[in-house]
Amino acid sequence: MMKDPLALQLLGEFLGTFILILLGDGVVAGVTLNKSKAQNAGWVAITLGWGFAVTMGVYASSFMSPAHLNPAVSLGMAVAGKFPWAYVIPYSAAQIAGGVIGGLVVWLHYYPHWQATKDAGAILGIFATGPGIRRYFWNFISEVIGTFVLVFGLLAFTKGQFTAGLNPIVVGILIIAIGLSLGGTTGYAINPARDLGPRIAHAVLPIANKGTSDWAYSWVPIAGPLVGGALGALLFNVLP
């Protein structure tokens, strides 16, 4: 057992985000890649898969850390006065690292299927988000709104009276709701680690038939969630 509380928390954030990305990017891979049994299962399957992925990531890590699994959540909790500012950057680094390794394991798990899939854009979409219509300002606004809902919802849950152990399920339902209602514009990163970590994995791994990692867009799923998370926390702070 680690004696350093921060080190244990960082391990929890790393492992929880790893599980989140393994299961979340895993469902996108299953729906997208040629010859996958789940191919063409559709958007609802993806949104459900991401909701379950968040729930499992939180359950897997909450005994070690607060299970933020998301730099925008860590920032929002700090803005709300519920988390030390000094921990925001270390948490974010652990979360991004977990995202990189999660992307790596998804690549290994589906290894034969990359060669069977020729669409480079679809392959990138397994690892990273991208807009339905590329208009950076509006893509940014979409990420702000989605993450605002996420962080405000998470903070509101802290005032709710949920039975012990149910919070991860409620969080997963919130993720599903955001995905179904707000995710169609950008693929709802709502989490810089969810996008940047696997995007790095896409960039460095020898994935068959891959193309560019679209770094020109990558600032949107980083900046949008951070702004949205901070705004959600600010609104929470001014409410009684």
From Swiss-Prot:
Parts forming coiled coils: none
Motif annotated as NPA 2, chain positions: 191-193
Transmembrane spans: 11-31, 41-61, 88-108, 137-157, 162-182, 219-239
PROSITE patterns to which the protein is assigned, alphabetical: MIP
Any one GO cellular component localisation term in the record: plasma membrane
SUPFAM superfamilies for the chain: Aquaporin-like
Domain of life per record: Bacteria
Bridged cysteine pairs (disulfide): none
Locations listed in the record: Cell membrane
Motif NPA 1, residue numbers: 70-72
Alphabetized GO MF terms: glycerol channel activity
Membrane topology per record: Multi-pass membrane protein
Keyword set, alphabetical order: Cell membrane, Membrane, Transmembrane, Transmembrane helix, Transport
Main location: membrane
Annotated function: Transporter that facilitates the transmembrane diffusion of water, dihydroxyacetone, glycerol and H(2)O(2). Is not permeable to urea and D/L-lactic acid.
NCBIfam families, sorted: MIP
Family statement: Belongs to the MIP/aquaporin (TC 1.A.8) family.
Protein name: Glycerol uptake facilitator protein 3
Taxon lineage: Bacteria, Bacillati, Bacillota, Bacilli, Lactobacillales
